[in-house]
């Protein structure tokens, strides 16, 4: 039989933390509806100004990224966006630089690209599962910083 040590009341730094209340479904739906309207307006501007827009959704597995994305894109013009799920890297992608598959998914001018999963999610997952060393992780972070700077500088 085993026992776990547990701090006494008052010994834990989380004792005084006020956990936020989860919004009710109606509030969530209202927020999604508002975001969808704003995104539809933005999509028109993106098309007119010929801007490429990359939207990356990251989060825990089974957190609902896909269902949120489905709700958000439901009313968008499908001619001007695409969706990709960034699964584990393929054998070909493993032979290429870490950010290759993300460069390959960059949207063309006037379109959105929604990525379900992103480079930080992949990098953190690889470190967590022992597939890369701390040094490789640090190199990956530097690559990400350069990639994000290129995206910001070049629209």
What label would you give each PLM region?
Residues 2-155:
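Glycine-rich phosphate-binding loop of ATP-dependent small-molecule kinases
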């Amino acid at each position: 039989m085993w026992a776990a040590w547990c701090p006494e009341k008052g010994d834990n730094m989380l004792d005084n933390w006020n956990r936020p209340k989860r919004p009710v479904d109606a509030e969530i739906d209202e927020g999604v509806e508002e975001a969808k309207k704003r995104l539809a307006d933005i999509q028109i501007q993106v098309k007119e100004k010929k801007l490429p827009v990359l939207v990356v959704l990251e989060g825990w597995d089974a957190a609902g990224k896909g269902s949120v994305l489905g709700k958000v894109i439901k009313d968008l013009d499908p001619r001007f966006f695409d969706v990709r799920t960034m699964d584990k890297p393929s054998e070909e992608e493993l032979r290429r630089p870490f950010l290759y598959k993300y460069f390959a998914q960059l949207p063309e001018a006037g379109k959105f690209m929604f990525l379900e999963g992103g480079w930080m999610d992949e990098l953190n997952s690889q470190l967590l599962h022992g597939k890369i060393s701390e040094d490789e992780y640090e190199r990956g972070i530097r690559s990400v910083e350069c990639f994000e700077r290129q995206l910001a500088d070049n629209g």
